[in-house]
Regions:
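Membrane-topology and secretion signals of cell-surface/extracellular proteins
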Residues: 187-190, 228-229, 362-363, 394-395, ...
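Positively charged n-region of N-terminal signal peptides that target proteins for export
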Residues: 1-5
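Ankyrin-repeat and related helical/solenoid repeat scaffolds used for protein-protein interactions
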Residues: 485-486, 492-552
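Eukaryotic tandem repeat interaction scaffolds
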Residues: 426-428, 432, 436-438, 451-503
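Extended repeat-based scaffolds of very large eukaryotic assembly and lipid-transport proteins
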Residues: 20-138, 142-150, 154-158, 167-192, ...
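Bacterial N-terminal signal peptides
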Residues: 7-16
Length: 570
């Protein structure tokens, strides 16, 4: 999608990190870097990084932990989903009032999105289709179906199909099933139909995907002869449905010699997403450091991720396999994914094992172990991470410690984290430190963060500063973003970034200003489209953006063109 491709090139000059790849591309196996750069959901700014850096994992998975939609809509002291301590109970009357305001805003925006579907700019139409899907605007379902095959631009057609999945209506399953089966259409469009079915989920969507893969008595399957990217996309979609009926087909695919290891690696991820405990032993064998049943790193990386979704702390053999992989696997990504999986299933014993690994690990391995301890809610590890931050010199590693301490809710770390902002090192360390202060709800830092927001000239840092202030419900972030949006001398990139920032902060009260920008036909096409994207973020009621399901717990070292494209959509 052109606007999203532009966003990649211009990301250093924009507030939010939404990113994209060009259309096209080929099916490829695992590599040493995330394909095409950062392919992540929107939220806070992250640097482009190799697939072995913690920033790449965080960019793909952060929505699950930040839960910005939930955090920004709280009228009380917010805490991160992964943060330590009990979350204060919101006042019921205030929460109900907020719910009503959100519903009213959403209802008012749906007609705006429907109107934007007919905009002369295909960028705006593309953004409007996705925004309509996020908002659950069923009034636009008919228009989306028509756009999916009539719009003159392929980006809009693809977005319309995916938007039908975001709407989540079972009544659209037959239409999407027909689009998936249309072998005259291009494979990416058909893959988007599969993804849409996965997003709708449930028995009927799973049945459509299974019928496509397995055939029927009157129409034998040609699935194995379909393009590899479409086959892999179908298996990804099966995992998204969450329906146990897909398990036999996925298990069979794992042993089907017609499917290569790259396809099978996606199958492993889907079995993990559906929590197929029957595959625990097999995946443990894939991951075993000594005498694994495969040498394919893509399969082993996927197994490390999947075991974290399928296992519990009581599965002693699986825990031992994950611990061995986190310590000693020759592949860096396997070690990292295994550590994160241990954090997700940790009990007191696993926490102690992770603490020991953190103490013994070389510097390169510590970011993921610190994050694993944060995911495990291991407050006992906070002093060790604090001490590591105090003496660390590598700014990337320091950044990971800041995020880990923020997720742990370790308020004792606030002065040390604040120092990372005040020392004015690289912008990424400052940005992550600011975000950590927001996660801690350290309101004592608000004046300092606001002063930096006003004085700094790097939009990437300003984006993280604005989100940090937003997490603490400080109104100055909104005021700065609105002022930037209205500034006549602001660049296209600054105005587009400000529009996106208002969406990231889910500011209902900024909707009139953002709508005005979209409707201003004299405004730059890029800014107008970002305004619609921003409105879509505000209208989305999901605690975690629906499209982030493709990125969370994904093996981002694998690449297929349709999935790469979905991962770029804002």
């Amino acid at each position: 999608m052109k606007i999203l491709r532009l966003f990649v090139l211009l990301a250093p000059a924009l507030v939010a990190p939404g990113v994209a790849l060009a259309h096209g591309g080929s099916y490829s196996g695992p590599g040493t870097s995330a394909p095409g750069g950062a392919q992540v959901p929107p939220g806070t700014a992250d640097p482009p990084a190799s697939a072995t850096r913690w920033e790449t994992w965080w960019a793909a998975n952060k929505e699950a932990f930040l839960r910005l939609n939930e955090q920004m809509r709280e009228d009380v002291d917010p805490t991160s989903q992964a943060g330590g301590g009990a979350k204060p109970k919101p006042d019921k009357s205030a929460a109900e009032l907020r719910r009503l305001r959100d519903e009213a805003t959403r209802s008012a925006l749906v007609p705006v999105f429907v109107e934007a579907l007919s905009d002369e700019s295909f960028e705006v139409r593309t953004a409007a289709a996705i925004a309509l899907g996020k908002a659950g605007g069923t009034d636009g379902a008919k228009a989306l179906r028509e756009m999916s095959f009539k719009d003159k631009h392929k980006d809009v057609r693809d977005a319309a199909v995916l938007a039908l999945g975001l709407l989540g209506r079972e009544t659209d399953i037959p239409f999407l099933d027909a689009r998936l089966r249309d072998d005259k259409d291009n494979p990416r469009h058909r893959a988007f139909a599969a993804f849409a079915l996965g997003l709708i989920g449930g028995e009927d969507a799973a049945a459509a995907l299974l019928a496509f893969a397995e055939g029927s008595p009157d129409k034998p399957s040609t699935f194995e002869r379909e393009p590899a990217a479409l086959v892999a996309s179908t298996f990804v979609a099966m995992g998204l449905t969450g329906d146990a009926r897909v398990l036999p087909t996925l298990r069979q695919a794992l042993i089907n010699p017609r499917f290569d290891d790259n396809i099978r690696a996606f199958v492993v991820l889907s079995l993990g997403r559906v929590k197929d405990r029957a595959s625990l032993a097999e995946f443990g064998s894939l991951l075993a450091v000594e005498r694994p049943t495969t040498k394919d790193v893509g399969l082993r990386r996927s197994a490390a991720i999947a075991l974290g979704k399928m296992a519990t702390a009581a599965d002693a053999a699986t825990v031992d396999v994950l611990c061995a992989a986190a310590r000693n696997d020759p592949d860096e990504n396997v070690r990292q994914f295994a550590a994160v999986s241990l954090g997700g299933i940790a009990d007191a014993t696993i926490k102690k094992r992770l603490e020991a690994m953190l103490g013994e690990s070389p510097t390169a391995g510590r970011p993921f172990l610190a994050l694993a301890l944060a995911i495990a809610h291991d407050s006992d590890a906070a002093p060790a991470i604090r001490a590591a931050l105090a003496k660390e010199t590598d700014e990337s590693t320091k950044s990971s410690y800041c995020i880990a301490l923020g997720l742990l809710g370790d308020k004792e770390a606030a002065p040390l984290i604040e120092k990372q902002v005040e020392d004015r090192g690289r912008i990424w360390l400052q940005g992550y430190a600011a975000l950590a202060l927001g996660l801690l709800h350290h309101v004592e830092s608000c004046d300092m963060l606001n002063a930096r927001l006003m004085s700094d000239n790097d939009p990437r840092l300003r984006g993280n500063l604005a989100v940090a202030l937003g997490l603490m419900h400080d109104p100055r972030s909104k005021n700065w973003l609105v002022a930037t949006l209205k500034r006549a001398d602001a660049t296209v990139y600054e105005r587009g970034g400000a529009a996106m920032g208002l969406g990231v902060l889910r500011l209902n009260e900024a909707v009139p200003e953002i709508v005005d920008v979209y409707r201003d036909k004299k405004e730059h096409e890029m800014v107008r489209a970002f305004a619609v994207v921003s409105l879509g973020l505000i209208a989305d009621p999901s605690p975690v953006p629906k499209l982030s399901r493709f990125a969370i717990d994904n093996n981002y070292t694998l690449a297929i063109d349709p999935l790469n494209e979905v991962l770029t959509i804002l």
